[in-house]
């Protein structure tokens, strides 16, 4: 089996390693690329090895040429909010990845980053057979008939749209989609719908966004603020899963949605905003919530709520609950190996899985 992993915002392709080792132990190959304006940054533990312009271990220029660059172009958002060069000599928290993916000054750019992400994943999917044919290390070939998408956070948002568009492209025109592999399943971990309201209600992102708007005279609670939210959502809508999730739920693709209750990055939901958050993604796809036990999500999307852990628990222990990482990864592995027919829920941390209603 092959997993296409889609990383979260301000992360990069190397974040897959935290999950890739678990999948590899079950003979599952994992591939990942950077989303637009992301890449291995200066403050990454992998910069010295895997940043294509600054690696001390690998001569990437000999492999790809002198003009090969990370997708963040070594540009960060400086202290004043303006573009600044990434500092590789003395990197700080500022010298990270993906600072320009969400661009409030150019909402069309944000929309296009979302849509470009989908196109990039379609190209990666169409390239899997060519990657397999290379087999440089004679390690075997990729099973391109068994491709699953696993997305975390922004990766779940983008991955939901990609899976939908990929399947529609194949179904509408077999010749057009001849190089596209059908997706056998999607794990959307801590993602959601209605990006603008996710950001506006996120304890992590909202304070920064609201401060930036206030600095330009657009204050929370005013009609101008509501107009901005409306205009922003209208602009990014063509790349937002809020417009794809209902279709996704009808395509016959197994889907597993993971939620961490009290998520401080992507809100679970809000009764006043029924199209926002992880709960909205589950609702729009028609997902059924599962508690501990074996779940079959081949005909109806599945929805699992973790009562402990944090936003990043799929990849790294957070929220003081390392067992949740083992639990969420075990769910992913069983989903991939069974194509959604027998998802093991609660095998590692049954007490941290919310019971089904």
Predicted regions and their residues:
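Serine-hydrolase catalytic core
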Residues: 141, 174-181, 195-198, 203-308, ...
């Amino acid at each position: 089996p092959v997993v296409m992993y889609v990383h979260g915002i301000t992360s990069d392709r190397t974040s897959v390693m935290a999950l890739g080792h678990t999948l590899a132990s079950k003979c599952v190959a994992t591939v990942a690329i950077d989303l637009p304006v992301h890449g291995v940054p200066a403050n990454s533990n992998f910069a010295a090895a895997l940043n294509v312009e600054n690696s001390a271990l690998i001569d990437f220029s000999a492999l790809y040429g002198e003009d090969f660059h990370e997708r963040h172009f070594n540009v960060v958002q400086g202290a004043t909010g303006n573009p600044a060069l990434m500092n590789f000599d003395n990197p700080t928290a500022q010298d990270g990845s993906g600072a320009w993916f969400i661009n409030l000054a150019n909402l069309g750019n944000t929309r296009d980053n979302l849509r470009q992400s989908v196109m990039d994943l379609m190209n990666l999917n169409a390239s899997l057979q060519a990657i397999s044919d290379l087999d440089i290390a004679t390690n075997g070939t990729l099973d391109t008939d068994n491709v699953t998408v696993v997305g975390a956070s922004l990766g779940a948002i983008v991955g939901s749209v990609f899976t939908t568009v990929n399947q529609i492209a194949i179904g509408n025109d077999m010749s057009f989609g001849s190089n596209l592999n059908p997706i056998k399943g999607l794990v959307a971990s801590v993602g959601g719908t209605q990006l603008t309201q996710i950001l506006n209600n996120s304890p992590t992102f909202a304070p920064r966004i609201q401060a930036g708007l206030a600095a330009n005279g657009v204050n929370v609670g005013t009609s101008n603020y509501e107009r901005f939210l409306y205009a922003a959502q209208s602009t990014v809508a063509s790349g937002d899963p809020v417009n794809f999730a209902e279709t996704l739920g009808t395509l016959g693709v197994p889907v597993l949605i993971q939620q961490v209750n009290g998520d401080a990055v992507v809100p679970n939901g809000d009764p006043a905003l029924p199209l926002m958050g992880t709960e909205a993604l589950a609702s729009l796809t028609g997902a059924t919530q599962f508690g501990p036990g074996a779940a079959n999500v081949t005909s109806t999307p599945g929805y699992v709520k973790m009562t402990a852990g944090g936003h990043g628990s799929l990849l790294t222990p957070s929220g003081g609950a390392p067992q949740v990482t083992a639990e969420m990864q075990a769910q992913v592995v069983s989903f991939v190996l069974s194509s959604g027919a027998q998802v093991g829920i609660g095998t590692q941390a049954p007490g941290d899985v919310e019971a089904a209603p």
